[in-house]
């Protein structure tokens, strides 16, 4: 007969947390579901996900504005924590985010989906996220948000976007890997939770880590860099007068730098980070053998 302590341990595991093997099975099942459902539904599910991540970057930008003299690390920590709201909204609302969808590699390696189904889902979700992010770009632009704090909010957008396009290609690739390692760790850990509170709280610090550290998220950049491009090239003279900066300083914010210098390497890094470093690694180690 088992002792009380052993029974209590088993009960605790059963009640409060899914086992690593169970999490691997959930990860596989989620990948199968995403890749085999009607992809028009995936596309429309991806649009709000892109919008949620964009709104999270709006929140982040607000926390980084007007912080002259504040601790750099603490300011970034606050920004990272508030940004986690975006990923929480994605999970709670059942939306599809490209970065977490890279973990469908698990379902592919298990043989339950084809390469075509996996890649089709990635492409559909990627462009759905892009539509959602750009929708928020235009809403924020027409709302005049760049003039908030006497133009300092828009200046934060400009400096953040410009910083992102000046990584080397390999730096952007590596930052993309690091980012999606943390995003997918956050998503994977939600498979262990059994309540909404479990799932929401477990994601906060991994997401805060990637944001505060400056790692690169392809979907977030679908908002931030286009927002910077529009601000740099279409702002009224009053904006530049308010921030007292020559607009030529941000002339390099353009489509070429966005796509070639950032979006492509970051996207590839996100695929490696989520699909290989987390999805395949954790599934291979923990799945029932």
Predicted regions mapped to residue ranges:
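Alpha-helical transmembrane segments and their helix-helix packing motifs
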Residues: 2-289
